[in-house]
Amino acid sequence: MATDLLYGLLPEHILLGLILVLMLLEILSVDKRAGSALFIASLLAGAGVLVMQLQTGYTADIVMNEIRIDRFSEIGRLIIVSCGAILGVYSLSSEAGHKYWILIASSLLGAMIILDSAGFISLFMGIEILSLPGFALMVLNNGKSTASEGSIKYLLLSSVATALVLFGLSLVYGSTGNLNISSFTAAVATGGVQNLAASVMILSGFFLKASVFPFHGWAPDAYSSARLPVTAFLASIVKAAVVLGLVRILGNAVLNPEAVTVIALLSMLSMFYGNITAIHQTAFKKMLAYSSISHAGYMMFALVDNTGARTEALLYYVAVYAVTTITACACFSILSGEDDNLDNLNGIFRKKPVAAILLSLCVLSLAGIPPLPGFLAKFFVFKTVIASGHLTVAVLAFVASYIGTFFYLGVVLRMFRSDAETVEQPANATCLCWTWGGALLGTLALALFMLLPNIFHWVMTGI
């Protein structure tokens, strides 16, 4: 038991130790480069531990069965720390201080707790630890007048999500007598008004955190008012953790037809609303916000599948989406800095061809253009949904995806138009070498996903 508590949660212990050391460095006013180096090293150490656990097939149920370490937990946490490392390298060029690294590390800790959860108590704690630092990150070192407004809107709507989840959990406890996730899924399968109400409230809270339509209201303002690395964090790691938390709750449970219908409807609305609204955006962050809403729809779309293959499809989709989003933000930083006006991309290929090509690959991957990993991610999701007999829904999702290609291709065409006048940009005062590092790391990760599309199937099945 003690060994499992130490080894099974060693990545979390590393992150907790990192947070404490970073706090000490902040108090002692130590050079911020020490904190950034420690952050990257700690995440690499955590990733190494997770790889070892996967190689040995390590599993454990600890803390009175509130925490479960299994392959899903290990893969999910590896995705989170890997994305955190890429984001960390990208953020080095933004001259982030110890406070920034403390907040990011705290959110990563919350994300990992979510993926470890076998009970709703630890799951709820993880969600709150994930979300709370985000409010501060949005206003940290941010001179925008809209930063506070976006942060407050995110805080208020996140509080609503928290209240919904808590009320749902009270109904779960009244129905099952405990807060174990497996007991909840078993109770939901039996039906009943109380179990239905609990499911609606818990799922609504998660949908709000994941910015699924119509619970998306906070995302455009929050994303557009934050600095670009923070926007990348909110759009990638936070969303990935929440979606994987939903998978943790549902597991391989067979959903009843009514639940499948509701999830399918919300996923369709998210896809169409996000893709159609993104077409009219002239700012990169706003476009990314509506893109993330549509991608949340694709992720929810995978939950329609009742064959059990949705877990592997969602792991691949979440990993590809998160890495692509961070890489796209890093490339945009190289091209335009903190000014997110898409007009800055006009004809930029002539000045910065490599960054323009990398951003184009990321954008086309988000659009689902073959043979990029974004296409493979959508292919796996569509395959699982069609296999479960939902052909009509899959056709509608394909139409939504087709609509989404318009605004993605618009970004690419801006960069490669020979007749466009390049907008003069102010000189960037910070060194972009680390931003390049984050962009290249993300590109390498995407290349790995493209070359090894079955990587999560192999790991989940222990091949």
Curated annotation (Swiss-Prot):
According to the record, the segments passing through the membrane are 5-25, 34-54, 72-92, 99-119, 120-140, 154-174, 196-216, 230-250, 259-279, 286-303, 314-334, 356-376, 393-413, 432-452
Main location, first listed in the record:
membrane
Membrane-related topology note: Multi-pass membrane protein
Quote the subcellular location field of this record: Cell inner membrane
Q: In this entry, which stretches build a coiled coil? A: none
> Mind listing the GO molecular function terms for this protein?
NADH dehydrogenase (ubiquinone) activity; NADH:ubiquinone reductase (non-electrogenic) activity; quinone binding
Keyword flag Ion transport: no
Please indicate if the UniProt record lists Transmembrane helix as a keyword: yes
Q: Name one GO cellular component term.
A: plasma membrane
A Pfam family (short name) is Proton_antipo_M
Keywords in UniProt for this one? Cell inner membrane, Cell membrane, Membrane, NAD, Quinone, Translocase, Transmembrane, Transmembrane helix, Transport, Ubiquinone
Q: Which cysteines are joined by disulfide bonds?
A: none
Q: What is its EC number?
A: 7.1.1.-
Q: Which reaction does it catalyse?
A: a quinone + NADH + 5 H(+)(in) = a quinol + NAD(+) + 4 H(+)(out)
| GO biological process, any | ATP synthesis coupled electron transport
Q: Which family does it belong to?
A: Belongs to the complex I subunit 2 family.
- Quote the subunit structure annotation: NDH-1 is composed of 14 different subunits. Subunits NuoA, H, J, K, L, M, N constitute the membrane sector of the complex.
Instruction: Quote the function comment for this protein.
Output: NDH-1 shuttles electrons from NADH, via FMN and iron-sulfur (Fe-S) centers, to quinones in the respiratory chain. The immediate electron acceptor for the enzyme in this species is believed to be ubiquinone. Couples the redox reaction to proton translocation (for every two electrons transferred, four hydrogen ions are translocated across the cytoplasmic membrane), and thus conserves the redox energy in a proton gradient.
Its protein name is NADH-quinone oxidoreductase subunit N
| Species this protein is from | Pelobacter propionicus (strain DSM 2379 / NBRC 103807 / OttBd1)
Upper lineage is: Bacteria, Pseudomonadati, Thermodesulfobacteriota, Desulfuromonadia, Desulfuromonadales
Gene coding for it: nuoN
